[in-house]
Amino acid sequence: MTVFYLTNAHPDIAWDWNRINTSDIHFPSSFAWGTATAAHQVEGNNSNNNWYQWEKAVDENGISRIHNNDSSAMAADHWNRYPEDILLMKDLGVSHYRFSIEWSRIEPQKGYYDLESLSHYRKMCLALINAGITPVVTLHHFTHPIWFEELGA
């Protein structure tokens, strides 16, 4: 909404925030302020999905796909630190948190469902609700299990 307004009011490629009057920008009281993440990018410690394989692969010249051969590895360790992250969200004043469920964690092998992972996501949702934050779940955010990749994805 704001970006649309600013783009129309100030079509320059770069906006000079010192010259832009934002006092007339208002959001309705029902506007949902939130944050968002993708499981593989924040949870960390997941070597069972297609993105992990892509991070480890090299191009046709043998060069790592990612500068310095970096990887998401532990990422932000949201898997273990979600209680702290939820406190930060609460302090930020958001009302919603959109996150993804990592398919390769809940179904690491075809037809096998990891109850501990399902329980983990349930606990995280309950912690969000207890903090007054509405969980908004994305069931598939780009990554999928290696077994699914091997089937042709």
Where do the model's predicted regions map?
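N-terminal carbohydrate-binding accessory modules
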Residues: 4-94
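Substrate-binding cleft and catalytic face of glycoside hydrolase catalytic domains
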Residues: 43-46, 86-153
